[in-house]
Amino acid sequence: MELPQNVQHQLAQFQQLQQQAQAISVQKQTVEMQINETQKALEELSRAADDAEVYKSSGNILIRVAKDELTEELQEKLETLQLREKTIERQEERVMKKLQEMQVNIQEAMKGAGINPGMGN
């Protein structure tokens, strides 16, 4: 049985939104990993003596910097990453809600067309 044009269109939109949700999930994982790395770096810095020589990576080189300067820089980076994480989470919630709504709409459209969704028709 051929799917009605409107159902085909809704399914295509649903698949696009699924891809978007997957991309958002990858972004979220990346940001979470960066947050963890930054937190670990801050923990290590907090254990170092105040006059310890510390270095930061800049491309392929290491540059010696003051501990407090690097700590401040990493704190700012952490705050930025945490804001980004919250933004991504809100985006993810919106997309997941939209996916659920679309799934219901597609199922109703298929029932209206005499197709039993999920039964392999």
From Swiss-Prot:
GO biological process: protein folding
GO molecular function: unfolded protein binding
Keywords: Chaperone, Cytoplasm
Main localization of the protein described in the UniProt heading: cytoplasm
Domain of life of the source: Archaea
GO cellular component: cytoplasm; prefoldin complex
Subcellular location: Cytoplasm
Function description: Molecular chaperone capable of stabilizing a range of proteins. Seems to fulfill an ATP-independent, HSP70-like function in archaeal de novo protein folding.
The family this protein is said to belong to: Belongs to the prefoldin subunit beta family.
Assembly behavior: Heterohexamer of two alpha and four beta subunits.
Listed name of the protein: Prefoldin subunit beta
Organism field: Methanothermobacter thermautotrophicus (strain ATCC 29096 / DSM 1053 / JCM 10044 / NBRC 100330 / Delta H) (Methanobacterium thermoautotrophicum)
Encoding gene per record: pfdB
